[in-house]
């Protein structure tokens, strides 16, 4: 009697065969001709691949979302990357594809990889060369075809998401023998004239031959030499060109590039509101810590009232000083005018005229008396005899001498009186001039003192005002700088935590090959199982050969 293994269910046997195939053929590359191609509305592609002797069924799940630019057809020569598995309901093995390359594209892919490695070694893809995009660009340059749907998508997104912008379109050919030269010349011209704050290099989807102009070295070098940040938006999300690695930012689609380059208006408003709330909160916190000092300065720094009160007090002080100066000047001016009018009056002239008239009256009186006496003498002479003539002459001479002495004495008195009056007038004039000079000097000293006091008072108030204003401005600037530094720190932290930037630092993410969920624990892995690893610039399929549990090692 022979012993035999226990019977197995069909499902169990099929699962065993499936596990064996998937563990040993987790990544295969098959070349052949497509047959029985069927693209379902769900986006899945079912096909057969054959050569002259064999036939293999296959499936490409979510094919339409990855390769919607070109639809495969029967008879196409292709190269398929995927894994072998078993379709249990029919009990047939098949290939589940995750990449499809048309025949003839293989040489281009090899050239793509060789050029990529060489340019990366020369530093054209270095992360430290990447430029930061402006937050709110005023001018946006777009290098693309002017007649395609790409430019319409970009304009539609910008008009919906931005308040105001200026867009410059540089028309180029995006496919063909001259496309690479036109694209590089467009980048150079935009930089030479400094026409934009940011550039979008855009093209719609296509095959690798259609997109090959963006893999040329001349375009990569033009992007590397650009001083204007460049966003690469070539093809679809699954399409990669060398321009994507050389550009400062890669966008999966042209519409996404427009969204990246210009935040939406609502987002900008929300960001500004959040910044405003943040600044208000920290301003209140800072001001509350200095409430005692502010209370001491409250009477001086009570918002605008302090400055108005200070200006009003300063104006009153200026007005008071000006009135005082005007009053003193008016008083001294009146006294000066009185002295001037008195000096310019005809008092002295009238006194001279009066003395002259008095002198004329005296002379006329003596002349009249002398004439009368002479007249009388002539009459006496006629009446006198000769013997009395000698006696009369002697007597007349005596009268003449007496009259002359009296006249001389009176003239002396008048002359002395006139001299005395002139001396008094001279002394009075000198004294008046001295008092006027002294008053003028006193007025000048008072004016200088008032001017100096006024200037010192004004300077003191101005210094207090400027000092208080500078203190407030310094406090506000200090507060704004602190908040700006905190904003930059948070922005850098946010950039560092961005998953795309994490990929750029050398990290990767593992996904289950079938279920498409992230693997975060070594316990979820099995030997000989296939996993997909996502890197910065693409994906790869790996086979698990060994598992080490860190917790087991620590224990």
Curated annotation (Swiss-Prot):
It comes from the Bacteria. It is found in: Cytoplasm. It catalyses: Exonucleolytic cleavage in either 5'- to 3'- or 3'- to 5'-direction to yield nucleoside 5'-phosphates. It holds the Pfam family tRNA_anti_2. Its main location: cytoplasm. One of its GO terms (biological process) is DNA catabolic process. Keywords: Cytoplasm, Exonuclease, Hydrolase, Nuclease. One of its GO terms (cellular component) is cytoplasm. Its EC number is 3.1.11.6. GO terms for molecular function: exodeoxyribonuclease VII activity; nucleic acid binding. CDD domains: ExoVII_LU_OBF (cd04489). Bidirectionally degrades single-stranded DNA into large acid-insoluble oligonucleotides, which are then degraded further into small acid-soluble oligonucleotides. Belongs to the XseA family. PANTHER family: EXODEOXYRIBONUCLEASE 7 LARGE SUBUNIT. Heterooligomer composed of large and small subunits. HAMAP family: Exonuc_7_L. This is Exodeoxyribonuclease 7 large subunit. It comes from Chlamydia felis (strain Fe/C-56). The gene is xseA.
